[in-house]
Amino acid sequence: MKKLITLILFVFSMVAVQAQDSLPDPNIPLDKESKTIKFSGVVHEKGTKNELFNRCVYWLNGYYKSPTRVTQIRDVATGKILGKHSFPLYTFDTVSNTNIKTAKVNYTFTVMFKDGRYKWQIDELEVISNKKVPLEEMINKNDPRYKKEWKSYLTQIADFIKSWSDNLEEKMKPEDAKKEKDDDW
């Protein structure tokens, strides 16, 4: 169901691809020190470091098809989970009136835990179509290699990460908070 919602978000974002130039610039965070793109958030949530770690593992198992292949580090002692994955990017084909998978994005995610809070981060993003393109190159519209579909790609990437982080934050809530929300009808 979660993946279906993410796919629907992608499809709706692709409807706007026809008018790529009219798309607003997506919010892509560039780290000024490292000059790399890093999406991140710190969330205050009830629970110990271990409880938050276990909730995240539960989320991983529901979110990813093969979570053990996705994660490279699952260290309870340090409170860190690190994984690598990818997702598709689409371009709208006006002839067939459909979205066509034209590229994929590789990314690395890290979730770190402390008592009462956790931090998530997505970085090392690279778009792969005919060749690997670091995301940092795609935000420079003055670059002679800039392609007009990159704006659509950046929008899809920002939408994916928003959906990913929203899903993580929802699953990281303690069970009693979820039940209270359900009971308030």
PLM feature spans:
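Ser/Thr-rich, low-complexity intrinsically disordered terminal regions
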Residues: 19-185
